[in-house]
């Protein structure tokens, strides 16, 4: 945290990315589960849309690692839809099968009827991956 504060004090660009990985300080805050750093960076306008060399956003990493608090923080920082490999966040979460992350996304306003580039909804993905629990969750909603 001290390093982040010092960098901001001297107006260093907090969105600068690593040459090799393309990751920003926001990516690393998520990857290392550092909520204070994430909050600090978001308050200073860190780019939540910035993708790394793998085309992953900080939100994608938060979903993959089941960091629901961070998912919520990122979603509340800006209302947005981010595509990763032509799929939307909710579609990606369904692929992982993590019901808690899926519920977190839905509870924070992610559109459950969104469609990917092929016109498939999250429910289509749940059926495609054979995840009965997720299918039931969508049918009950």
Swiss-Prot record:
ANK repeats lie at residues 21-50, 54-83, 85-114, 118-140. SMART domains: ANK (SM00248). It holds the Pfam family Ank_2. Keywords: ANK repeat, Repeat. Transmembrane segments: none annotated. SUPFAM superfamilies: Ankyrin repeat. Gene3D superfamilies: Ankyrin repeat-containing domain. This is Putative ankyrin repeat protein FPV223. The lineage of its organism: Viruses, Varidnaviria, Bamfordvirae, Nucleocytoviricota, Pokkesviricetes.
């Amino acid at each position: 945290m001290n390093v982040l504060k010092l960098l901001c004090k001297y107006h260093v660009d907090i969105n600068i990315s690593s040459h090799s990985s393309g990751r920003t300080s926001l990516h690393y805050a998520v990857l290392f589960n550092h909520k204070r750093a994430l909050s600090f960076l978001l308050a200073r306008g860190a780019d939540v849309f910035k993708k790394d060399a793998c085309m992953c956003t900080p939100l994608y990493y938060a979903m993959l690692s089941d960091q629901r608090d961070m998912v919520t923080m990122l979603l509340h920082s800006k209302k947005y839809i981010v595509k990763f490999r032509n799929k939307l966040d909710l579609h990606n979460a369904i692929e992982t099968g993590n019901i808690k992350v899926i519920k977190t996304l839905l509870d924070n306003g992610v559109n459950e009827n969104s469609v990917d580039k092929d016109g498939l909804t999250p429910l289509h993905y749940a059926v495609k991956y054979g995840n009965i629990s997720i299918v039931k969750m969508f049918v009950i909603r």
